[in-house]
Each structure stands twice: as structure tokens, then as C-alpha cells.
Amino acid sequence: MDLLERPAPLPLLRAAPRGLEIVPRRGALWRVARTDGYVLGYVERVTDETGPHYRSKRLIGRAERFDVIGEFGAPDDAVDALRY
């Protein structure tokens, strides 16, 4: 993915995520944070031969790697997984 690719809005969610802010980062990556600014993690849209799905992931401590929480068919589910 080109790092200069324009960020895209997260596909329409079933309900507005109460108490969360979803910020487009680049291309198909969004940061999910609480309204106080604490970053919960990221949602990334991944497309393969089965179609698009949404991967929830968290940054591990100060490391530069992510812990994948799960992959979901709907963006709402990927965002919800980061709440817990």
C-alpha cells in the first residue's frame, strides 16, 4: 500500500460508536480512540478472494508491531472488538 494514498472514510457503521472517535490514517487504515484521546487500536480493511473484511489490531506496548484481535465481516464488529 502506498503511504501517500488518501485516507478513506470507514464504511457506514450500523450505529455511531458512542464515546469513540474514528480517524482515517491512510488508505484503508483507521485509528480508533476514546474521546479523551486514548488510542484503543486500529481497523484495517483487507480485501482478498473472499471479498473485503476488517482486521482489528492493537499496538503492543512501545513495540512497533501489532497484536491482531480478529477479522470481521463488518466494520462495526471490528470497532467493537477494540472496546474490550
Where are these regions (language model features)?
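Low-complexity, intrinsically disordered short peptide segments enriched in small/polar/basic residues
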Residues: 19-20, 36, 57, 76
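Short aromatic-glycine-(Arg/Gly/Cys) micro-motifs in beta-strand/loop hairpins
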Residues: 40-65
